[in-house]
Amino acid sequence: DWTIFKPSVIFGDPRGRMEFATQLQRDIIGSPLPAPLFYPGLLPFGAGRFELSPVHVEDVASAFVTALQTPDTIGRTIALGGPSRLSWRQILETLAAVAGKRKLMLPVPALGISMAAVMLDRFEDFPITRDQIKMLLEGNVCDSSGLTELGITARPFDASNLLYLNNSNEGPETWHQNAA
């Protein structure tokens, strides 16, 4: 018997490990450099508009447990997405707000950064790989109906569910506790 889960990007308290929001907070929001709004092609139309539907790690864990107890899930593939489709820009703006920062954002051609990643992604400090850029531009969205079917209310990607970032050892010491 099997059930396959296909979650969108997962966020939530990583308990000392790296996850989606923690990595973005450390590598992009915490960086003195402007945040990249990637775009395909040669002109910056649509920079940062590709969408993701972040899903909370505890919602994913609840889905696993519920599926083990629900025979109707056997032999199914269940997409797990958060309650909202958010653009890359919206995600970065949310993370900046949680950090208590205003972050400059600039259009960056995906082709250029992909070429740089070919040469630099083998270095640990290079913040993004070619595969990550490709996945971001393709988007990673699904709705929360998989969670709803399992009786789980999806948590939004918002300040109240990102407060763990304020306690993270991965980011700047200046993150504010009052991001809500």
Description of each model-found segment:
Residues 1-93, 97:
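Oxidoreductase cofactor-interface core, primarily capturing Rossmann-like NAD(P)-dependent enzymes
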Residues 19-53, 102-140:
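Alpha-helical membrane-targeting segments
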Residues 61-128, 141-180:
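Mid/C-terminal beta-alpha module of Rossmann-like enzyme folds, strongest
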